[in-house]
Amino acid sequence: MRTHYCGQINAELAGQEVTLCGWVNKRRDLGGLIFIDLRDREGLLQVVFDPDQKALFETANSLRQEFCVRLSGKVNRRPESQVNKNMATGEVELLATDLEIFSRSEPLPIDFNQQVSEEARLRYRYLDLRRPQMNEKLQFRAKVTSAVRRFFDDNGFLDIETPMLTRATPEGARDYLVPSRTHKGRFFALPQSPQLFKQLLMMSGFDRYYQIVKCFRDEDLRADRQPEFTQIDIETSFMSAEQVMEITEQMARDLFKQLLDVDLGEFPSMTWHEAMRRFGSDKPDLRNPLELVDVADVLKDVEFKVFSGPANDEEGRVAAIRLPGQAENVSRKMIDEYTQFVGIYGAKGLAWIKVNDRSAGREGLQSPVLKFLPDEVIEPLLERMQAETGDVLFFGSDKSHVVAEALGALRLKLGKDFELVSNEWKPLWVVDFPMFEVADDGSLAALHHPFTAPVNVTPEELKANPAAAISNAYDMVLNGVELGGGSVRIHENAMQQAVFEVLGIEKDEAQEKFGFLLEALKYGTPPHAGLAFGLDRLVMLMVGASSIRDVIAFPKTTTAACVLTDAPGAANPAALQELGVKSIVKEDE
């Protein structure tokens, strides 16, 4: 139907006849001529219609925005005065000789020249995706997946599919359940990840596996979450954690170099404890220069219980952030707003000190908490914070996890508000995570998943002191975004049983849910390790989008609905009866 894409037309084709297909992006009449900008996935091209060709000109006169057409004509150089340097094809235009209208368009229900709500964009997604900026994002995504496949194919990995219909596993979120018609009363679950199947593939001898795979989680949504998302899934046998990190880091470096011409360099490594201590986050944005500094030892003997209480509590922490040179710009109103902000993360308040004159000691400071601080702690505190004239110090004092979350979030907000974040790429590995975390009910939960191997402990030692166990896990972080997470897996039956026991999973329950895995672990399981990247999140970061919905063709809303197709919808009663399922929700609920 066509010989070229619009975006391929350039001065080298001047004088040639070409045929193009696409949509009318814009139409204008000027000096007795009709001009249109023809658009396809590769770009725009100006087309001109000569009034001397009466039949063609009459047809062109009926063209309106978003008509879908085929055009043939001769490529001409534009006069120098008419060259449009804002268009990639701005040196040339097409003098039309033939026009076929494939289909006409009614007036568009949305005007993309104005601010359009996200719901409207999703409702008319097929129109939204015609916009060049959306088209470019999805084309970029396609380039990412192609580059990923090439990399793993070239490195001896096998692309193997795993089941979409499986059984529920405890991976931290609710499952999407699929009722079985042939096994009434029983349900499949859509996979939250291919975790267990890829481990079984290692046990089957496929020592290098990868898959670009859909995963499903029924959870509350945020800007970087979707109920269905795409994962770059990797698993290897006979490779150490360091080797897995090395090959996946190389993949990331190659990807950024090929597609963005960005050299990420070697990734530094940081322990989880260091990340939480310095940045209040296990996915720190290293572009932000602000850090959390511990000051509990300086303030542990003051009479002010807000500081001394947590400073003398084994589970407490007192830390501060130094905001350099902004004392004059930080108003009391801003401090009140920051106090409310940290309250979202559980902080009971936000103490602060302005350093108006570092050389004047106490007299050069401004703060409502100064009256509670004796002279002997002032200088050590300022030295610890490396405070200088014009700085503002913000304090967090509470349980360690509250201080980390509150000051970690404040660090990011201060970095954004005062434009401290550099415009560069800052990758790192976060390693040595705790094996377990304390759940809301006081029980232990796996920080990653229950198939992650601990570092250098026996099953007996793990059960005796699970809180001290370190997992052999690693997360790849870039600019504050977790690109991927992985770990060395448990490959011994006794250790897997021990982890289940620590997690409070009884033997009968473990057998019911994971009997196939425990059985497989009896028959010569190789040491294995892997990692999974969130493809949507990776592309979002690379193209600079604010939400993964901008890099998914047909995403769901924040309520996990598709406004385009009006899904989820009510099921046919006959289909429910055949499945042995009864709806207890009324139609209007």
UniProtKB/Swiss-Prot annotation:
Q: Does the keyword ATP-binding apply?
A: yes
Region: Aspartate, residue numbers? 195-198
* Stored Pfam families: GAD, tRNA-synt_2, tRNA_anti-codon
Any GO CC annotation of this UniProt entry: cytoplasm
- Where located? Cytoplasm
- List positions binding ATP: 217-219, 226, 482, 534-537
Annotated protein name in UniProt: Aspartate--tRNA ligase
Q: Can you name the source organism?
A: Idiomarina loihiensis (strain ATCC BAA-735 / DSM 15497 / L2-TR)
Question: What is the name of the gene encoding this protein?
Answer: aspS
